[in-house]
Amino acid sequence: AQRNAALPVNQGGLGLAPDNTAMDRARAMGFDVDNPVYHGTNADIESFNTSGKGKTKGAGAFFSDSPIIPETYISGNQGGNIIPAFVKDDTLAVFDAKGANWNDIPVDSLSFKRKKASDLLGLEKGDYTSTDELASYAKDKGFGGVKIKNLKDRGANSDINRAKEYLKEKYGITPN
């Protein structure tokens, strides 16, 4: 990968220096390497299942800018992983939940680039939606995903100290 990335762009490379790093390559491919996101799972995974399963079927993979929130999706007695990742923001619909809970977001309060979410995604005015529904609607409208700011999403399994210890031990990350 390092050698191919050093090739000129017109030869299928990224035009990077010969001693490029994985972070250099990720940045050149458009990933936001300055702002990691985190995914919580009980499974050992090699790739993200973006087709989803159960109630999140079709909604994609879920990430947070805080490692604490994904930790709430891990059952403490089953081990689990908090996986740091990078995403490309250029295809995301960005919404501000204004402090709403993940499953009770007022549709009328959401907008993206000055368009109401009800018009943009075909949601009913006066209704409430969830992160799962927003992601599915956005996918159907051609967005690569959604980024939802100011959202409440803490599960019953929340253990802030456990999440911080895990990230420090496994990845050398010390979250705020």
Regions found by a protein language model. Give the residues of each.
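Active-site and NAD+-binding cores of ADP-ribose-processing enzymes
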Residues: 1-176
